[in-house]
Amino acid sequence: MNSNFIEFIQDVLITIHENIRDLKERRSFADPEELAHIEGKLLAYYEILSALRSSATEFKIPHDQIGL
């Protein structure tokens, strides 16, 4: 697999995981209205990760090779 492509996917995954971590931290002191927004964003990030895992499996790309 092209090394630029792998670096790109890994960069995207790092960003997603950083955003998840930040949202989990914010969740601990969020007001109820913001909490609903945070939970929605977390769910969206988890769905993206799930889709990436499924696609990687379908295309026979080893998860560890791209950082899943």
Language-model region placement:
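Short intrinsically disordered terminal tails
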Residues: M1, I66-L68
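Short, charge-rich amphipathic interface segments used for partner binding and complex assembly
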Residues: P32-Q65
